Each structure stands twice: as structure tokens, then as C-alpha cells.
UniProtKB/Swiss-Prot annotation:
Pfam families: RNA_pol_Rpb1_4 (PF05000), RNA_pol_Rpb1_5 (PF04998)
Physiological role: DNA-dependent RNA polymerase catalyzes the transcription of DNA into RNA using the four ribonucleoside triphosphates as substrates.
This protein's name: DNA-directed RNA polymerase subunit beta''
Gene that this sequence comes from: rpoC2
Cofactor dependency: Zn(2+)
Keywords for the protein's UniProt record, in alphabetical order: Chloroplast, DNA-directed RNA polymerase, Metal-binding, Nucleotidyltransferase, Plastid, Transcription, Transferase, Zinc
Catalytic activity of the protein: RNA(n) + a ribonucleoside 5'-triphosphate = RNA(n+1) + diphosphate
GO BP annotations, alphabetical order: DNA-templated transcription
Description of how the protein assembles with itself and partners: In plastids the minimal PEP RNA polymerase catalytic core is composed of four subunits: alpha, beta, beta', and beta''. When a (nuclear-encoded) sigma factor is associated with the core the holoenzyme is formed, which can initiate transcription.
One term under GO cellular component: chloroplast
Organism phylogeny: Eukaryota, Viridiplantae, Streptophyta, Embryophyta, Tracheophyta
Amino acid sequence: MDEGVNLVFHKKVIDGTAIKRLISRLIDHFGMAHTSHILDQVKTLGFQQATATSISLGIDDLLTIPSKGWLVQDAEQQSLSLEKHHHYGNVHAVEKLRQSIEVWYATSEYLRQEMNPNFRMTDPFNPVHIMSFSGARGNASQVHQLVGMRGLMSDPQGQMIDLPIQSNLREGLSLTEYIISCYGARKGVVDTAVRTSDAGYLTRRLVEVVQHIVVRRTDCGTLRGISVSPRRMPERIFIQTLIGRVLADDIYIGSRCIAIRNQDIGIGLVNRFITFRIQPISIRTPFTCRSTSWICRLCYGRSPTHGDLVELGEAVGIIAGQSIGEPGTQLTLRTFHTGGVFTGGTAEHVRAPSNGKIKFNFNEALVHPARTRHGHPALLCSMDLDVTIESEDILHNLTIPPKSFLLVQNNQYVESEQVIAEICAGTSTFHFKERVRKHIYSDSEGEMHWSTDVYHAPEFTYSNVHLLPKTSHLWILSGGSCRSRGAPFSLHKDQDQMNPRSTERERRYLSSLSANNDQIRYKFFSSSFSGKKKDDRSPGYSEMNRIICTLHCNLIYPSILRENSDLLAKRRRNRLVIPVQSSQEREKELIPHSGISIELPINGIFRKKSILAFFDDPRYRTKSSGITQYETMGMHSIVKKEGLVDYRGINEFKPKYQMTIDRFFFIPEEVHILPESSSIMVRNNSLIGVDTRIALNTRSRAGGLVRVERKKRGIALQIFSGTIHFPGETDKISWDSGILIPPGTGKINSKESKKWKNGIYVQRITPTKKKHFVLFRPVVTYEIADGLNLARLFPPDLCQEKDNMQLQIVNYIVYGNGKPIREISDTSIQLVRTWFILNWDQDKKSASAEAAHASFVEVRAKGLIRDFLRIDLVKSPILDPRKRNDPSGSGLISDNVSDHTNINPFYSKPKMKQSPRQNHGTIRTLLNQNKECPSLMILSASNCFRMGPFNDVKSQNVIKESIKKDAIIQIRNSIGPLGTALQVVNFDSFYYFITHNQVLLTKYLQVENLKQTFQVLQYYLMDESGRIYNPDPRSNIVLNSFNLSWYFLPHNNYENSCEEISTIVSLGQFICENGCIAKNGPYLRSGQVLIVQLDSVVIRSAKPYLATPGATVHGHYGEILYDGDTVVTFLYEKSRSGDITQGLPKVEQVLEVRSVDSISVNLEKRVENWNEHITRILGFPWGFLIGAELTIVQSRISLVNKIQKVYRSQGVQIHNRHIEIIVRQITSKVLVSEDGMSNVFLPRELIGLLRAERTGRALEESICYKAFLLGITRTSLNTQSFISEASFQETARVLAKAALRGRIDWLKGLKENVVIGGMIPVGTGFKGLVHCSKQHKSIPKNKHFFEGEIRDILFHHRELFDSCISKNFHDTPEQSFRVFNDS
């Protein structure tokens, strides 16, 4: 080395950065030749030392870290606990995922940090250890995978796989770990192949954009500069930014000038700036250069090759393009080695310095409760919070920064190194943040419920998306379902029993059904007597076939039973027993059908004056369309609403039109609804005959007058039969719509009246304004009988009205007066229907508390099975507020039935250990938004379980006593805002039927058993104000009653336990798993309380999903969700793996200006605001220019920061000036706006900013334009050279356009000259081709009036301009990255 210089002796390890600094200083001191000689000596020394010893690498050198075992065990324990909390509904899926990732990432990082000290202590000369930190080959990450753990892997999309690989490569991987590992390895291989080509193409585009940028002048004469402040950035970045630049202004310390304008900045000057803390420093950059087609030496600065100002003729554009593109190519190759291992970051924690009590100012203005990112309860600090920890002998003071989470309570005892706060992650820990949507899918079928914390109104009209104002639970109440494929009817009626395993069979039935199938045979439930063993079945007891019909008729009254009706149709004071028969059996036995259809309400409860059955008289049927007409009549509702519940679903008799006359008239007409596209072959108001073709595939059935009318959904074509009468002048017709003339009211001598014996319907037709005629249409008269003979239809015993319960008959017309009736596909239309109304006398004592309950009774005798519909008068606990909470009244056995007749299986010893049968449940109707296509829901026994023992029969007395004491809590008050409450009583119970009636035993029948199904009393929805909503009667969702859990309470003291339980559990309440209900331990499943009985609680199992504010809920309240449906969507920020494979597309995205959500939106707002306000202040000529200038400056700074962020995160250093040259080109155009029309430019034409400015000055008129960001591809196709554009892309189009416009190419760039074969205007060819214009030098300075004016207006006021421009410039990467969110 040079011996004349005294060099300082250093003894420390130097890395790549230190080598760079050394070379830089050597060049400054000794020049290029000496420096290369010195570096040769360093190289020789390095190789000599490296080859002095031979290091071999064996598998035994891979030493596993000893602490790995317990670290992994601890992480697994945390993951298990997290899984439990998620299952209980304490944390939601995103919080679980986030915490799981951070637990494993922290474990992996800790192992990696342990690796180095472990090697240093146990084996400092371990070859793996020496190699991993040499920097030659391999890095700490790869060694960590060999001897630590592979940790979390990324999938090919860069997303995280949340199952970590716990093994390392030394130990070997399990099969699952190997497959996950292959994901990451494949990602590395694919990235290497694909991204290399991407990086090459990126380089090509970059070079296309800037190939014509050459250093052509020494000084462009600009007065502008960009401010850089040492306070706003780390010192390292500050030095990188300044070195090699040229000052735009003189720099003073006090009155002393330490650096002058146009002086280039070296390391010495930078150190002085840092020492004196001068700010701000104004520097020249490519952004400030006055031309877009070239650059001057002073705006570019030093050449990176020889450390002096750049030479004239240097092709700096191509150097810039290569500098940005090349690291992309190089870095893609680097991904292969780490093989897709995820590298992210975790939040920083504040730990307690010692044991002691923590104290802080618990003020609502300073801290308020919140949830951390992991779902833990915490206190959020809104500003700096001073925390004191008092130990025995010392006080520790800590300051928690704002937006941090405090994880401890005030006055809590903390241990040393306990985490007391979590600092908001968003500083330097995370590499990339992006906003991600996470959809949570339902893993079971069920019904959606939520609390009042969810907005019940959807976000938009007709949408099913609801927003959450605060953290709350969503519940999926379990139950299977069978979807009907568009079938508008259900096979099952409410409360029917069903076998869930027959769902598939039912789907096949539904798909093959048509609307014409009147009766459908279906095996509805299989009956077996539960009281006996399965082997010991009754002889000959077969499955019962229940026939369900698609229309109203559930059951048909058989007429064979009339002869022995006195025996089989018994009726006591409060009960009707009516024999029923299915239509299929009737067809088998060839019995004439009496026509009565019995109709059951949805919930099985008849209120007073409810409809029991209806009778369709065949005399009142028609097959044609038409209008019903009758004289004015009194219309009034028979039933008034009473009680609490709005019984929409219970078919009360609320006839629209109650008959008070004895006849009505039907005016027939023929109607065709045709689509708009169909061609009609007849004209409006024309006369046609029978079987005339009126459309392509349609013929008329009757002749008459044609009327064509356009409707919303098509064309209505009506054919009116009758005769046409042209009135004379004497005839005055004042009606337009039509008048009905009943028979006997016309003139006796008139010929027409003889034709129309039944009456006529006169209608005036006006085809034109002056012409009109009258149409006489025939009328059909229907006489209505006084009433049907009940004795002919029902046993006479039922019709006597001396006792309480009775039947009444009411006729009513189905269609209103003048209402049009449309036939549907040749089905007959019933005009009059006869209703049988169930009525009874009310006692004064029980004013409105009585209801009738219908239940099916199947009686099997020797060789004979009969179904009976039994209607009991019971006191309904729902209708009577006093009785609503009383379990005794909610039983379906009426009060006068003796105890020895029915034995409840809950208390019977032989049935103690039997579980509910797997294949049974009841069907219930649920709320459904879509009325046309109902869905069916089944609850099965697989989801229910029970706890605790059954109780003895003795306990019945205790129950009766405790009922009197009113121990159960008020149901309605306790439901509160919890949404739906279901009240179910004794579902699917099997009863012995023991009778002491000697007549039945000896004379006629032996009743072997009677199976009675007890039904759900009422299914209702209750909102937060306590009002009750009824389910929609038209929707048929089927619920089996068996997704239920029995929870039996401790049976030592019923009254006390009942009072205790009632304070904890209320009907409709949701219970999370592991919550305590009673003293005998925690409850094991989540669910909703369905029945509260004195000794047990029945719970319908449910799955809770926690949702936090900002989440969106899909689906409506009460909607049925299927397996795999989206329940809720979370929007959250997550860190992406810090790979250049994510970085390279990001660079490309920024350069192609595709990141809509981050840059463009912000810029558009800024452009609009600037243009609007500055134009208003300064007037037109300057407003657009300054608005566009400032916007462009802002966007340039943001783009530079964003690109630098990506490369710096990979440890790649690119000088800002290279990026600035590229960014200058993509931001140099403005878009001519359409509102300010100009004579020079076309609307939406892209022109250079300088050109727009000069043209505006020359023409002295305002040109309206705004800043516009072009991507690098579009910039390449918008240059001044069509030859360059055509050689890049779209050759034919570019050349054709250029020919049409007559474009001239001045061959100023490199590429054009290469294509033509001329001299390239750079380097040595520069001086021969380009001469400096003498004219430019001769322009006096005062001619720059435009620049002077601008400077006076805005730029000279340094404070204002700095505040606009320098806020974001060279900001810390994290801050600028937060401003422009990742797309």
C-alpha cells in the first residue's frame, strides 16, 4: 500500500457496507488507479486466509438447539388454548389466525436467535456456524431451517399457511410437513422461473421510457430545488440522498456561507451538514430540470462511475432503466434458497422491569377498553401514559406511547418481565401491510341468529349484508335441511314427523313433481312402539303411510265411518274426536269422497272461530277466466284480534267478502298473456271467430271482440264474447267501465233481453275519439244455497250445539267484486268455498285464555288402523299473560284427563335410560325471506345429548307445589334483546294409552297402543322491545325438534334449585360452551335454551361466531344457512412475506400506475382541490399550471418513496436519481380537459406540461388541463418518436397512425438511430451531432418573466412551498408507505 500516508489500524469485522465506504474514501484520496491496486491486495489476502484451512461439512455438524423442545411445547399449548377460545366464541377466526401465526413466528425467531450463542458456547469452530455468518454462501435463515425449525411457510400466492413445520431438516419432516414444505419449495422454483422473465420485461419497458434521456447541457438554468431535512429521515438514508447531488441554493450558518449554489456534495460536506444540523437543504434533482427530453449535468449530479460531475453525452436514461431492472433479476434468483419460508414481524412489547404493583392514571380521556389484535381485553391509550411500578425498594417509571394496548389493570401485581403493554405494530417491524378480506364459512347447517348489536336493516336496499356497530356474537342454531329445487310447495306440513335419512328421497320426489300432482304418496314416518324392546314388536305392525297433498287438503274426512260414527266419533264437553282418512286409502277402498278437507294451523293451536275445515262445492267451479260481480254487501271481519300474538299463521276466519246475498254473477272472458317479443296476428278491437290464430303458437278458444293491452311483463290479449250494438243519437251511454244488468231489469219487449236470460254485462268500447260502440256480454248466474246439511257431512253428534265446542258454517266468495280471475293451465277455479268454523262458548272465568289444540291419534285394533284428529280445549300459556310461565298449563293434556291415563316418559322408570330416537323429529315453520321457494329444515338427534340422571316418579308432587309458588322467572322479561325464543313442550313423547272402558275392550276393539305426538306450542320471534313476530305462513322451513340437549338439574331440592336456575337461565337465552348453569359443573356445549322445566333444561345446540366492528354479516335474521355458506366477512390488515416476489410485482404496479386504491385516489382528490382553489385565487392562466405542477411534484415524491421502500426492504441500494429519471417521464404529461375547449388541442389529448405552459403563454388563452399519471407501457407509446414506439409494441397500429397524421421523427433518441442505422447521439457521437444553441446563451435573464412570476407567486415563499412539497419527500419509508396503502 501507499507508504507515505499514515493509516489508522482497525481491528473489527467489516461487512459489505463498510467495504463500499472504504472504496469511496480511497477513490477520494488516491484516485482510481491506486484504489484498484489496494483492492487487489485485499482480494489476495482474503483468498489466502480462506484457503489456509480446509473446512468440511458433515451431517454431525448440524447441532439441534437444546431449548427447542420446551419452546415448541409452549407454543403448542398456546395454540390449543387459542383453539378452545375460538370454539367458545371468545375470539374470532382472524384473531385466532393472527395470534397463531405470531406465536409460531416468535418461537421460530427465538430459536434463530438462540442458534448463534448456542454454537458459540458449544462449538465455536463448527463449520456450519463459520459458513453461515461468513456472507460467502448461505445465510442464517438456511442454517436455522437445518438446525432450528422450518417454521411457517408461504403458499404460492404469498399467503400464510397457518400450520407450522415444527421439525428441522436435520430431524426430518413428517408427511404433512413435507407436503406443506413442497408448497414453499415449489413457490421458490416457480418464482425463479417466472419472475426472471418478469424482471427482464420490466427492464425492457424501463429502458424504452428513458432511452432518449442524455446529458446535453451543463446547466439548464432552473431556480427550483427540493428540500431535504436531516430530521425527517435516518442518517444513513440522508447521506445516501445527498452524496453526488448538486446544491440548488447557497447554504449559510448564521451569516457565513459554507456551500454555494451549483456545488456538488461530497462526504465531507454531508458530514458538516449533519454536524451543524442545517435544514432544510435545497438540492437539484432530475425533477427540477427544465426539459423532459434531456437532462443537464447539474440536475443529474455526480456520475456513479468516477465520482465527478457526469460528462456531456452520457446516456443516463439507459443507466437508470438498467439500475432499477437489474436488481429485480438478481433478487428473483435469491428466493430459491430460502424456499418460501415466511418472514413477517410481531408487535413490540413493553415488559415490567421488576416485580411490583402497577399504577397509572385511569382516566377515560386517556384510556378506554378495547380488544387487542388477538382478541384479548385491553386498555387503549389515546396519548402518552405514565406508568409506575412500585416494588419493595424502588419505583420504576415507564411511558407507554399512544395507540398502544395496556394489558394489565390498575393496581395489579405484575411479575418481572411480564408483558404489560403492546406497542402498536406499524413501525419498522412489518415489511408489507395489506388489507385482506377473510370470509368465515358455516361448518354446519342451521338457522342464523344475532343480537341487537347487529344492524337489522341491511347496508343497501335489497342486499343481505349487515354491518356491525360493536363486537357481538352470531349464532347458527343447528339443524339439517332439505333444499327444494324451486318447488313452490312442501311435502310436509308443520308439526309432522319425519325421518331425516329420507331427505335425499324427498329431494327426488320434489324434482319429479309437477303442479298437477294432486296427491303424493310418501312414507312419512316409521312407527315403532318405544315402550317395548325392539325385538318384541307388535305382530303385524307395519309402517304407516301418511299421504301429504301439495295443496291445502291435509286430511280428508271419510264417509265410511258414518254407520258406526256413534262409536268412533266421540265428543266430550271440551273435546272433538273426528275420524280422518288419507286420500290414498280412500282411493284403495273406493269410497266416495265427501269433499271436506281438514286444515290444521301451522302451530297446531286453534283460536276461537278458527277455520277447521273447508268444503269446495263442485257446482261453483269454472274453467274460464272472467270477472265476478255482485251487489253491494256488508264486508266485516268475523274475528277480532285478541291477546298478544298476531295470528297471521293460524288461518283465522277472516273472509274478505262475507256473503249477505243469495246469488252472484260471473262474466266469462278469454285472456292470453303473451311475451313482448311475440308477434300478434289480430288487431285491437277486431272481431274473430272460434279457433282463430292469434299468435304464433296460440289459438282462440272462443270468438268475439279482441282487446290488446300492453303491460309491464308482456302483452295482455283479451277476447270478449257477446254482441255489438251501435247506439243511435237518442241512446245516451254515460258509463265507460261497464254495468251489470241482472235478469228481469231490462225492457220486456227488447229482443236482447230474451237472449240474455241470466242478465247482461254492458261495456262501452271507444276505438277512436269520435267512434264508440257497446258490447253486450253474457253472464253466468250462481245461486247460493242457504247452507249445507252438516249431518250429511259429519256425524250428528258433532253438530249439536248444546255443549261447548261446535262447528259453524260460513260461505264466502273467493274473489272480490269486479276482480279479474285468471285461469292457470286448464285448472278449474273455485268461486265459492264453504268454511267450517270451530267455535265454543267462553266461560266468564277464563275470558280469552282458551284455545283448542289439535293432535293426531292413531288407534290400532286387530287388523284395523284408524287415524283420529283430536281437538282439545286447553288453556294456552301464550295467549294468557298470567299463565305464560306455567309449565302445567303448557302441557297439551287438558285438565280433565286423569293422571292414570297418561304417564309422562320423563318420569317412567322403564324408559329411564333410553335416548331420544335417532330418526324422529318434528317439522316447524320458520321465517323465510323468499316466499316463493321455501326451504326445509330438520333437526336430528345426533346433535343432542343429555346430562344427569332422570328423576323418580315421586317428584311429581314436588313439582306441583313449586308451580304454585311461581318459581319460574317471567319469560318475556328475561328474553330481552336475545332474539328468538322457542317454546317447546314435550316433543315427540310416547305415551301408554290405558283405558277402562269395557265396551271398547270386549265388544268392538282392543286398543293395543296409542302413539301421540305432542307438538310445539308456538314458535315465535321476539324483537328487542319485547314485541312478538309471527313466522310467515307461506314459508315452509322444516325443523326437527331434536338438535336439543337435555340438561338435568341436581334433584336434591327442587324448589331452591328452581329459583336459582331461573336467575341464570331464561327461555331463548344463548349459552356459550363451558359456562356454568348450575352447581354440578360447567355446561359442555353451546346452544340456545329451548325449554326450561323444573328439573331440566333443553338446549338446542348452536355454534357461536364472534364478529368485531367493521365486519359484514351475510344473510338475514332467521335465514337458513347451509354448510359452506358465508356467515361473516372480516376486513383486516396483515403482513405479507417480505420476498422480492411480492416486491417485484409491487414495483411494476407502481410504475404501471395500477395501484388504484393507494395512489390514484389520493392524487385525484389532490388534483381537483388544487385546480379548483388555485384557479379561483390566481385566475385561469396560472391556476391550471400551478395546480398541475404541485400535483405532479407530490405524486413524484410519493412514487419514488414507494419504489425505494420495496428495494430497501430487500437490502438493495439504488440511488434516488435513477428512480427519479423514470418517474419524471411517467409524470410529465397532462390531460386536456373537455370543459375548457381549446383551439389548439383536442379534448382528452395527452401533452407535455411544458408544452401546455408555452402554448398557453404564446396564445394568451387559458387551456384547461390536469395532471395525469401514465404507466411505463403507455409512456413508451406516447413519445416524440414513432419509430421507437413501433419497435416496442403494436407496430402496425403505430405506423398506420403516424402515416395518417404525417408525423415527423427527429431521431433524437438512441433507439430510433439504431433502427435507422445512423450515428447514436451519445458519447463520442454526441459532439458531432448536437451543438449547443448560441441563441440560448444570448437570451437576457429578465426575459424569464414567466419563471419570475411563478417564483414571486408561490415558489419564492419557501415556507409555503416546502409545506406542500417536502412533507413526504424522502420521508421515513414506513410513514410514506402508510400514506400510500399497498394495493
